[in-house]
Design a protein with these regions (language model features):
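Flexible hinge/capping segments at coil-to-helix
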Residues: 36-47, 51-73, 164
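Structural detector for helix-capping/boundary residues
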Residues: 8-11, 20, 45, 66, ...
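A ligand-binding cleft/hinge motif common to bilobed small-molecule-binding domains
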Residues: 26-35, 85-87, 94, 108-136
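Short loop/turn segments at beta->alpha junctions
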Residues: 9, 64, 106-107, 125
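A late-sequence structural motif
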Residues: 74, 127-129, 136-182
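Residues at or immediately flanking beta-strands
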Residues: 2-4, 98-102, 137, 149-151
């Protein structure tokens, strides 16, 4: 068995599933699965505000979305990340403004790097705070925070034993309470 981790966008990962180049893919909704595939939710996490360390809002414990109305945003492009993009847009619209997107980046690591360089601020999945990026501060969103959803997609049938075991293990990691009750 060989495990290879590849970072890509949802459309590319689903193409990899269809072409049998990928056995299990972590994808973000919305997406359309062909009938031979299935998916299940593995993560529903609040998003955080990513700020350069010298930003005035980095001194606060938590930040309401409305406080970002005059900020420049660095976001994931909608065509390759509609779920994250729409969650951020909708949260900002509920707070009374449309985010001023001055830069888009196709990978979360690039977004974090651009924020650290002072290009703008962003709203990112909470897991990004564990990436060890230097020169960046993360703050919880005060009030109604958008959520980042992550699903595991895989072939419904015709999976190798290794792929079946990987799906089972990942399912147990994502839902330990269900595994304990089984």
């Amino acid at each position: 068995m060989r495990i290879t981790l590849t970072e890509s966008n949802t459309q590319s990962l689903l193409r990899g599933l269809r072409e049998s180049a990928v056995d299990v893919a972590f994808v973000r909704p919305p997406y359309v699965l062909d009938a031979e595939f299935e998916s299940e939710r593995v993560l529903d996490e609040p998003m955080l505000i990513a700020l350069p360390p010298d930003h005035p809002l980095s001194r606060k414990r938590s930040v309401p979305i409305a406080a970002l109305a005059d900020e420049d945003f660095v976001l994931y492009p909608r065509p390759i990340g509609a779920g994250l993009y729409d969650a951020i847009q909708n949260a900002c619209l509920r707070a009374g403004f449309a985010p001023r997107v001055i830069q888009e980046a196709p990978q979360m690591a690039s977004i974090v790097s651009l924020v650290a360089a002072g290009v703008g601020i962003s709203i990112v999945p909470a897991a990004m705070r564990h990436m060890g990026a230097q020169g960046i501060e993360y703050r919880p969103i005060k009030g109604d925070a958008p959520h980042a959803l992550l699903d595991m997609a895989y072939r419904r049938h015709d999976r190798s034993i290794a792929a079946r075991n990987a799906v089972d293990m990942l399912r147990q990691l994502a839902h330990p309470e269900a595994a304990a009750g089984a």
